[in-house]
Amino acid sequence: MDYFDYSYKHNYIEFSSTIYRVGTYHYNWHGETEILILLKGRIEMSCNDELFTLEPLDAVIISPQVGHSTLALEEDVIAFTIHVGNEFYQQYDPDFGSYQFVVRSDESTRHNQFFTTLRHHAAMMLLLMAKGESPVH
């Protein structure tokens, strides 16, 4: 069940975002970079054969074409995802589409400056979209 679904395309940037209830095992991959921020509950996530658990406020950044899956470990688990098209990154690095990476927070990094800033900007983008304003300035 999606609570929020938004897409945006303008010149050099294309992205979509969704807030949804995480349920049963869901395996996928896509051509965009995915940022997942866990808002509520706990999930088990697998990325390129690495299995880990996410807690509320944890974030994961997954490069294009990296297979990944999520599984709710309890009821009423809510996640916020942002998918960013490759064109945005390829204007800075033409080889970006060939990279594979997974960057994730855990208990020791959840509140560091990088992940705190990532969550802050994601929340600000969400607020602008909800108000009908452009999230890109």
Which residues are covered by each model-predicted region?
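A hydrophobic/aromatic-rich effector-binding and dimerization subdomain
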Residues: 2-16, 67-131
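Conserved GNAT-family N-acetyltransferase fold
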Residues: 36, 60, 82
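Short, solvent-exposed positions on alpha-helices
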Residues: 132-137
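Generic protein-terminus/edge-of-domain signal
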Residues: 1-56, 96-101
